[in-house]
Amino acid sequence: MSNLRRFSRSLAVAALVLLPFAAVQAEDTVEPSGYTPMAGESFFLLADSSFATDEEARVRLEAPGRDYRRYRMEPYGGVDVRLYRIEQPLEFLKRQKNLHRVLAEGQFKGEGLSNTLAYLWDNWYRKSRRVMQRAFSYESRQQVTEAVPELKMGNAMTAPTPYDAQPQYAPIPGLPLVSQFRYPLWDAKPIEPPQDVKLAGSSSEFINVVPGNVYIPLGKLKPGLYLVEALVGKYRATTVVFVSNSVAVSKVAGDELLVWTARKHEGTPVPDTKVLWTDGLGVMSSGNTDADGLLRLKHASPERSYVIGEDREGGVFVSENFYYDSEIYDTKIYAFTDRPLYRPGDWVSLKMVGREFKDARQSQAAASAPVRLSVIDASGTVLQSLDLRFDAKSGANGRFQLPENAVAGGYELRFDYRGQTYSSAFRVAEYIKPHFEVALDLAKPDFKTAEPVKGEIVLLYPDGKPVANARLQLSLRAQQLSMVDNELQYLGQFPVELSSTELTTDGKGRAAIELPPAEKPSRYMLTIFASDGAAYRVKTSKEILIERGAARYRLSAPQRFSAAGEKVEFSYASEQPTPLKPSSYQWIRLEDRATDSGPVADGRFALTFERPGTYSVELRDDKGQLLGATGHSVSGEGVKSVPGTVEVVFDKPEYRTGEEASALITFPEPVEDALLSLERDKVEATALLSKGADWLRLEKLNPTQYRVWIPVREEFSPNLTFSVLYTKGGDYSFQNAGIKVGMPQVEIDIATDKERYEPGETVTVTLATRFAGKPVSSHLTVSVVDEMVYALQAEIAPGIDQFFYHPRRNNVRTSASLAFISYDVALPGSTSAPGRANRSERGVKVLERPRREDVDTAAWQPELVTDAQGKASFSFRMPDSLTRWRITARAIDDNGQVGQKKQFLRSEKPLYLKWSGPTRFRQGDQPDLGLFVFNQGEQPVKAELLSGPPGSQRSQTLELAKGVNYIPLAQQPLSDGDWSAELRQDGQVRDRLAVRFNLLADGWQVEQMQNLSLAAASNPLQLPADARDVRLRLADGPAAAYLGNLDDLLEYPYGGVEQTASQLLPLSIAYPALAGGEPRIRDRLRLIMQNSRLRLVQMAGPDAWFAWWGGDVDGDAFLTAYAYYADWYASRALEIQLPAEHWQRILEPYAKQATQTPLLQRALILAFARDMQLPVNTLLGGLLNDLANAGEGQARAEPLEADDGLVLGDPDSAVGLAAARVLAVDLARQLRVAVPAPLAAQAETATQRLREAGLPFTDALLASRSAVDGQQASALLQRLAPAQSTLERALALTWLQGALAQAPQGKLPQPPKDWQAQRGASGETYWQWRGRGIPSWVDLDEAPARPLPVALSYRSAQAPSGQLPVQISRRLLRLVPGEGAFEFKVEEVGDKPLSSDELYLDEVTLNVPEDTALRYGMLELPLPPGADVERTTWGIKISGLAGDEATTLERARNEPGELFYGVPVDSLSGEQRFRHLVRFSQKGSFNLPPARYLRLYAPEQQALEAKPALAKVKVE
């Protein structure tokens, strides 16, 4: 039947050809078949290696095997594969833009007519049989089929037409077709990892076996280049297959390429191979390999290039090369700081030295040039920029101060030198004073290996009370002392497992600890986290040295390898005087851990290693303590390297010019040949293992080991790379080993007159520099830093020798042609031309220690020059701190030779005093004072303590236990002035301590001012009886008055957005005039600007808008503009460049909030923008129209006072509108914007209203419209007072900045008795009253030549002029720890005394009538001395505040003050509640004033707590 059907189909085809088409149409219609051509799915095709002629070539196909896409491919029956041979392979490859993905256009023809004709024939066949059935009766048909069974229809009438998937692409014309076949893709075994692949310690199922991911075998092919075409439906992918018995290994450098061609299996050279070096766009160079298979090609190396080649057999290969400069020879600037870690507010000292390198060896001094330094904090903000001068010989040095609010993290020093940018780094961490002290009392001062470390952790509150039941968490990390190759250094920190990591203190605040013994000399870093239930833990770290006095012996042999059975002489010598002597050696064979030992004596011993391998030889004393170690390799039969690697061991770690370097080469298998080369900036020399060369000697030791000798020449320094490369069995491997040529360094000797000093003593450091054993004059930079800084942060800057003369990196990159990957992704075909692609084709809490000075850098000498004899010295005062200090000296001479040395000294004192309590009190306070006495000895001692104010000291006898002792002091009446303590032992003074007490008034005080004139020798003063902080300042002339007001602004206690900007704005304006004065004043002003600017940055809200006190709340258009205005002036003063679009942001909130913003604030915003050179004409037109239509403003019941704020306090008043009109009209005239007629008519009336108001702010606004003489400016500036709005004072100073240009008219004489001369932030001198009582006269030595105008300021109580309708209620709740961490319950304190070891919740509730809304207020809450508000409330939950559920405390928001804290209240309406965590550390009895709420822009309007909840506080 099948033969009959095929014959019938042939007839049907003939009928279609011969019969007219119309005849076909005459037949019955054909029903739809429902058949659609097989489309297929996308797949990947790739060749992941090259093949030799005896290997079966294959390609990899990755088809989607686990989703619906598989079912779109599976009916195709597999994948059609066609294999073509490319006749001119190099020409073909040269035309390719991407050798990984070659382009070979397909000939898409579609499926063809075979399936269509099959369906038509079956359809017509059925119909014809039906016709035949109707022509004959059933009986006739039955008789015929019985006679001829072949004529039976069977299932032919009902069986569906079978369809065959045909290739839809024609063969590629012009390419010989080697073979084609359909590979059963879905029946083939997928690629899977070997059965024995198991990865210990991780999942071995990381590779899933996926159907459709298969290798397709192509058979063994002749040498050449082949193209593989894979087809599935409309989808087609191509890739190339390289078949060659040769492999090309390439070494690319900056301007050349070395190619070595070798047999793939044997590894022997292949000569006369044609090689092309291309970058994908064209051939850069070409040539043929020589008899050794080597070829050098010259050309500048691109980042990516290819080597394509064809050997004499026709084999084709390709390798890909990547090049980048590892070592760049240019000017190197070595920049480092005095220490790696700083705290906010610290001074950072830095030094730069430089050399200009011509190549790896030659350098000259970097040229003198200016350096622009930028300091960038951890958030990426530029803090400041400095201009330094770099000198060719001495380099550059500078210093700057970090802001007090500097963020923690890594900081960058970025400096521009001669058009290039360099960088260095340091870190900043904030150390917070803990609310209790953590001390570690060790059982003994020194511990040895194998000995447990025992001791006690002691926790004490500042008042000496023990911290009972505190939870401790311990973390121990060990740094082992390394003695490999005689280098004694601490290795990386590794955690040490503790038997118990959590402890609890007993009733005495003590917890015993026992740390595991160290097996080897180590440094233990014990970190302790202690918590008494506070919101955060106290962290402290302690350094414990295990056998810190261990000797260091240098152990060496003539060479680092030998032959098996060869006698090796080892020698050893101590590097420092020590009583420890070696008694034995021990060797360990690393391959099997076999070991042996023996005695040593007289500084040498001999060993004979019978078995080849790698050995570690150690030197130990009679206690088994490690004193020295070295490594040794032994050659011999059977030694192999790890498979896939080559081992190269040189006999010495370092050589001198003229010596011969000997290396032992070990291969993992016997090899016939290998490529040996010397490399650095290019391949300097080559040799074959089978032939050798004139630059080396070779000796074959056994089939896998060779020995090579290389004479060391001068040009090898500082180092050269020796490379060994071989290829065999289809793999290649290479190993680089460095030949280091020793470069002499500047040797530095550091000597001090003794090893231990007491605080306050003068330390003299003597330095000596030598080069090649002879004295040499050098430039030294020396720092003396607290060693614990390096325990927190290791040195960031590399050693100066490592920076300038580090081993040069190898600039040669090695690659091979063995694993070049070519790939393609299958895409559907189309009979139309493809569209052009629219793309380019081109490719912490502080460590608490006995210290009274927070000094981390004791001395810094940025430029110390030794004389011709190499001598120099310097001295410094030992800081008042007991610790170990690290002296680091870095040297560089005029020839560029460098050196570095570090040494240690200690500051120690047997008995040490430390004050831990507060020094500020209120009048009438009765504190229970005490201090800490540290007994640094090992035994308890007796001593005598004298303490008290001068003239009335009291004596008490002390029994001082080892460690820290808290000593309570007898109660004495407090007074302003000095207080001292003196500790005596055996009639000698062991330590002294001095503090100064300040007594504040027992109630609220405000700063007040009087303008006086000193005209006689004796001048009366009229001060109230409660006056405090009395100051006298010169107000003679506008400049003095201006700076006096600037000082008042800078001393303002609060720091919201407006207050910070009000400090920053006038200071930035005055800074250029003040920067030319005293450097100390300049640096301080610069720091204040940085602090203020950084605080503004930190208070920025969403979209960089600003609210009154920052935070994630809706920004305010006026405050945003004001902050940017101040920052604009500050950035110019600090020389910080910001993009122009940055300043455009002030107009964004104006556009959104103009209708809700008061007109006065809108006028000021546009005035700010005008000063910042922003376009405002259109916005000004809108403001002018709104002002023309505005009324007269809101009427006030009472006239404005001088202390009332207008801009933020009452901008819509009549005076506020008048100020807006005057500002806007003046601005319109400057910009030539038309003023509406109604507004022009109102202008004069507005000006007159401002004159009548008589406010300092409005008078300053009027004065800014015209020139003001010095007398007028001085009079106006003297009217500004600290009680007035900071915003309006700042704007007045901005408008009157011309007063700074006028020369000062006089200066204060020498202060009389009891007055002390001090200087404000701006550098202006003032007198501070230091006498007893209140001054009533100012007595001068003589009458001044003319009356001197002065401003007398003081703090005194003042009754508020207005009582606000605010009810204040305050309560203090004790926190009782709950079951979980950071969970508490509360209980009322009542009349019970407070405890210094507990935590309290301070809750304040404000209530105002519902129809009242108050803006911009401050809630001030008094605290007793020693009380602190916890900085964070994160994670704390408190139950019992409102209902049964626990309440999570909101984020703490407060401003610190003198014996109080403030809470900013942006808007007050209804009832608001504020909660803060408070701790009371000072014992005693204290009286507190009531809490108060005041409006910051109308400070005379206040509300006081009616019944003070904390009027009397007793702390026990």
UniProtKB/Swiss-Prot annotation:
Segment forming the signal sequence: 1-26
Molecular functions per Gene Ontology: endopeptidase inhibitor activity
InterPro entries: A2M_N_BRD, Alpha-macroglob_thiol-ester_cl, Macroglobln_a2, MG2, Terpenoid_cyclase/PrenylTrfase, YfhM-like
SMART domains, per database record: A2M, A2M_N_2, Thiol-ester_cl
Annotated Pfam families: A2M (PF00207), A2M_BRD (PF07703), MG2 (PF01835)
Keywords for this protein: Signal
Superkingdom of this protein's organism: Bacteria
Family as reported in the entry's similarity comment: Belongs to the protease inhibitor I39 (alpha-2-macroglobulin) family. Bacterial alpha-2-macroglobulin subfamily.
Protein name: Alpha-2-macroglobulin homolog
Species for this entry: Pseudomonas aeruginosa (strain ATCC 15692 / DSM 22644 / CIP 104116 / JCM 14847 / LMG 12228 / 1C / PRS 101 / PAO1)
UniProt lineage: Bacteria, Pseudomonadati, Pseudomonadota, Gammaproteobacteria, Pseudomonadales
